[in-house]
Amino acid sequence: MNILPVLLSLAAVPAHQSHFLNLLLPLWLAIPGRINARSFSRYSGWNERTFRRHFQAALPWHALHLTLVKLLVRCKAIVPRFILVMDASFIPKSGTKTSGLGAFWNSCAGRSETGLELSCIALMTWFGHHCFPISIRQTRPKKEKADRLTQYLDQLRALFRPHRAWLKEFAPILVADGQYAKKPFFDLCRAEGIAFVTKLAVNANLLIPFV
């Protein structure tokens, strides 16, 4: 059984994007070597510009991923107990023409380097060690947009806005590393009614003002 049309229908994906994704996703798995608009065109028969036009628009990946998780829960394939995890991933990239290129922290090298950064929020099951990415955004460099913390907060708010009730019931805990241990993150998690598990910096101020 092909589950993709079912997911596209449940996620209420618009017809033009549904038609595109029905072709794109099986093709993505079948193409050998480098993946780009030209290789998609070569193996599909569609014009290269068609792929570029669709990729310039926002595709509903988060809706598909979350719909898949809800479908697995409904089918009792996984236990509906999750934690939210959030982290950023660095991608080395040289050149000057790539969109979003900037200086980002590379934890493997222990320093900032030129490249790209993707911020990911995922659902991780308590049992079975399954992980489902549900929101991925490219972090913009400082010269283009606000600082990284503001972008991370915007991403988290955008996820909670349409799915607040479901996430609060099935994923009441957010886990992130020390770079997210800032007051705005604690305030947001408190406002959403979820617990925030993180690692504080060595110079964190834990003093409670006397009232």
For every predicted segment, state its role.
Residues 39, 49-53, 107-170:
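Electropositive, glycine- and tryptophan-enriched low-complexity nucleic-acid-binding patches
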Residues 93-100, 132-135, 148, 186-187, ...:
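Short, conserved acidic/polar surface loops in the N-terminal third of protein domains
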Residues 139-211:
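An internal, acidic/charged active-site-proximal segment
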Residues 32, 64, 113, 178-181, ...:
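Short, glycine/acidic-rich beta->alpha junctions
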Residues 27, 55-132, 140:
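Active-site-proximal, Lys/Arg-enriched surface segment
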Residues 26-30, 41, 107-108, 175-179:
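Short, charged/polar micro-motifs that form catalytic or ligand-binding hotspots
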Residues 1-53, 63:
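Gly/serine-rich nucleotide phosphate-binding loop at the start of the catalytic core
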